[in-house]
Amino acid sequence: MTHQTHAYHMVNPSPWPLTGALSALLMTSGLIMWFHFNSTTLLMLGLTTNMLTMYQWWRDVIRESTFQGHHTPNVQKGLRYGMILFIISEVLFFTGFFWAFYHSSLAPTPELGGCWPPTGIHPLNPLEVPLLNTSVLLASGVSITWAHHSLMEGNRNHMLQALFITIALGVYFTLLQASEYYEAPFTISDGVYGSTFFVATGFHGLHVIIGSTFLIVCFFRQLKFHFTSSHHFGFEAAAWYWHFVDVVWLFLYVSIYWWGS
């Protein structure tokens, strides 16, 4: 690398944005193939290429930040702004789903029987699995905060314990959500209720899986002593993302499960 007299990281050309975009195309196309033709080949190919891209891109970022020291305070500031803008874009993404839900439920059309939930739909009891899911995610919000405070205080063991608990709760939430989908008395094709329910909660579930993956990477990085109390933006970004997932679930629970039932 040539000598530089500024504090900014000039990133080398990378193939991972392109392979990431192609894997996203394969996954979305694969999802359509699965829904319409019951074939999972394309979906599996997309998931495989996505996981390979994630591994190699994360490897590059860890090398540049932890081992080459490219993540100066100026670079970290830019990354913080980037993460904040990303979370704002995700908020707007979910706003679209809530808009669709309230548009359909506040003024039900005659086709829906003029009522909400529509005639023939038996909604899930909000005081059963959904309430358990809420308590699981709230507990994970507490444990990720504990992990962050432990890291700031230099208590590595407590940080690892808290991070492990958060990951376990995230996996538990995903399993509960999967069992709920399996046992639900309606499907994604059951009119606007099924569509809004499964798309909104499904995309949230996808975000929980992404957040859990992010935290697992942080866990293995901390096992290798990558984070210090003053240099840990990778973990901080994961914590912000997890809190965002937490808050979105509270809105989903109150809107779709509790009020919508």
Swiss-Prot record:
EC supergroup of this enzyme: translocase
E.C. code: 7.1.1.9
GO biological process, one term: mitochondrial electron transport, cytochrome c to oxygen
Record-linked InterPro entries: Cyt_c/ubiquinol_Oxase_su3, Cyt_c_oxase_su3_dom, Cyt_c_oxidase-like_su3, Cyt_c_oxidase_su3-like_sf, Cyt_c_oxidase_su3_a-hlx
Sequence similarity: Belongs to the cytochrome c oxidase subunit 3 family.
Its biological purpose: Component of the cytochrome c oxidase, the last enzyme in the mitochondrial electron transport chain which drives oxidative phosphorylation. The respiratory chain contains 3 multisubunit complexes succinate dehydrogenase (complex II, CII), ubiquinol-cytochrome c oxidoreductase (cytochrome b-c1 complex, complex III, CIII) and cytochrome c oxidase (complex IV, CIV), that cooperate to transfer electrons derived from NADH and succinate to molecular oxygen, creating an electrochemical gradient over the inner membrane that drives transmembrane transport and the ATP synthase.
PANTHER family per UniProt: CYTOCHROME C OXIDASE SUBUNIT 3, CYTOCHROME C OXIDASE SUBUNIT III
Designated name of the protein: Cytochrome c oxidase subunit 3
Species, as recorded: Gazella gazella (Mountain gazelle)
